[in-house]
A protein has these predicted regions:
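Long, C-terminal-biased catalytic regions of enzyme "large/alpha" subunits
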Residues: 1-90
């Protein structure tokens, strides 16, 4: 990496206070589980909404809450099944 580039690696603060690299695959797997067998919902829509609100060293607990909030914010008259995704994440 040259001096003109920013390091875009984000980190997660675990409950014990240690940090680790943010792993989008872990988030994706949780969302795949939460959306399994629910029609009319999209893992990528939840990821996009949540990604806007992520920041470096975010606590792991906040990521969980953010996924719930992101799914809940997608609930509408046309996409009511996000309520079931949010419920699974709780």
């Amino acid at each position: 990496m040259n001096d003109g580039q920013l390091n875009m690696t984000m980190h997660v603060t675990k409950r014990n206070g240690s940090t680790q690299d943010f792993d989008l695959d872990k988030v994706h797997k949780v969302l795949e589980w939460a959306t399994a067998d629910i029609s009319g919902v999209s893992v990528s829509e939840i990821e996009i909404k949540a990604n806007i609100q992520l920041y470096d060293k975010i606590p792991a607990y906040d990521i969980h809450e953010l996924l719930i909030k992101s799914a809940a914010e997608l609930i509408s008259e046309h996409t009511p099944n996000y309520q079931f995704v949010a419920a699974r994440l709780i």
